[in-house]
Regions:
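Active-site loop segments of alpha/beta catalytic cores
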Residues: 1-4, 94-331
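Generic structural "secondary-structure junction" signal
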Residues: 3-6, 10-16, 25-26, 54, ...
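A gly/proline- and charged-residue-enriched helix-loop-helix capping module
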Residues: 68-108
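N-terminal basic, low-complexity leaders that serve as flexible interaction/assembly modules and, when applicable
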Residues: 1-67, 281, 303-331
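Glycine-rich, proline-tolerant flexible connector loops at the mouths of alpha/beta enzymes
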Residues: 45-67, 77-78, 84-91, 117, ...
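Short, basic, glycine/proline-bearing loop/turn elements
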Residues: 11-24, 80-91, 208, 228
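A charged helix-plus-loop insertion that forms the helical arch/lid used to bind
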Residues: 63-79, 133-140
Length: 331
């Protein structure tokens, strides 16, 4: 998940002087913000600070990231003519600042860097809706009513994702994560028909890079098996599904990531600690488990609680199939 953000005083200090667009397009700022959680929390990996629409924004599609709203598209893409705005993405020309930031981080970070990109469905939902949505009505109307056009759009966006992540690995990223934040809006039937072919191609075309490939979506408990079928090495499980239930839906050779409910941390450490141990217990000490939040860090979370989460996982997490004393599944 995105580790940096408004929960960190040091991030807020940077944002007091620089807009979000500056932070994701100026390599020095990107590198600093990406590194902040590593310094403060002692996490085992960093994830590139960026936004899922950064590539299409840098291609001139007409996307603006508005504070408190998210990505907003001036002219939504809803016709065949609109697709011409999704041209071939050239990372070294359109967004050279990303590789520059990755190279800086790869040289200086004490932990591995995870590259970051949006999945075609989620990026398409922003481009078609014109911004965040609760119903995805325009997106689904295009998907159901113009299937050929829909697959053309997602194929182009898959090309963008592939190019972006390949460039990040070339610059030094040691793993990559594909975020399908809004895939949970789809039924398994629709995901399999309208999204899975494109997700499968993404992971296939990243396979030769030899780095772990992570697939994550929000509200995707019913899609976990399909997300694994796309071919990633790791599938992220959000907080809505008990981790052991989610793992049961995955093939035995696929690793899993998750899945502490982020908002639990708002309750303080006494509430959070047993929930951390519950996640560890449900993982069963598996070497395939990557402990993580079930989504991003909420702005109101106390950084001190997150530091305690990391320390507890380091102290009591296991990878040999055993559990530390006191690590139990909550009733």
């Amino acid at each position: 998940m995105r580790q940096a953000g408004r929960a960190l005083p040091e991030y807020r200090a940077i944002r007091a002087e620089h807009g979000f667009h500056e932070v994701v397009t100026q390599p020095e700022l990107t590198a600093e913000v990406t590194t902040q959680p590593v310094r403060r929390y002692g996490v085992d990996a960093a994830i590139l600070f960026s936004d899922i629409v950064t590539p299409v924004m840098s291609m001139g599609v007409g996307v603006e990231i508005r504070a408190g709203v998210g990505p907003v598209v001036e002219q939504p893409l809803r016709t065949a003519a609109d697709l011409d705005r999704i041209r071939t993405f050239e990372p070294d020309v359109d967004a050279p600042f990303v590789a520059e930031a990755v190279a800086m981080l790869a040289a200086d970070l004490p932990v591995p860097l995870i590259g970051f990109a949006g999945a075609p469905f989620t990026v398409a939902s922003y481009l078609v809706e014109g911004g965040p949505s609760k119903s995805y009505a325009h997106t689904k109307a295009l998907m159901y009513g113009e299937e050929v056009l829909w697959h053309d759009l997602l194929a182009r966006l898959a090309d963008v994702t592939i190019a972006s992540l390949r460039a990040q690995v070339a610059a030094g990223a040691e793993a990559v994560q594909v975020f399908d934040s809004w895939a949970g809006a789809l039924s398994p039937l629709d995901y399999a028909r309208y999204v899975l072919p494109h997700a499968t191609r993404i992971f296939a075309e990243l396979a030769d890079l030899g780095v772990p490939r992570i697939h994550f979506g929000v509200g995707t408990g019913e899609l976990l098996g399909l997300m694994a079928a796309a071919g990633p090495d790791v599938v992220g499980v959000d907080w809505r599904v008990p981790l052991d239930h989610g793992v049961a839906r995955l093939p035995a050779d696929v690793s899993f990531q998750g899945n502490l409910e982020p908002a639990v941390c708002l309750g303080g450490w006494e509430v959070t600690a047993p929930r951390v141990r519950d996640v560890l217990a449900r993982a069963g000490g598996s070497p395939r488990h990557v402990f993580n939040l079930g989504h991003g860090v909420l702005p109101a979370i106390d950084p001190g609680v997150l530091r305690e989460v990391v320390d507890l996982v380091h102290a009591e997490g296991r990878t040999d199939g055993t559990l530390a004393d006191g690590v139990v599944v909550l009733p």
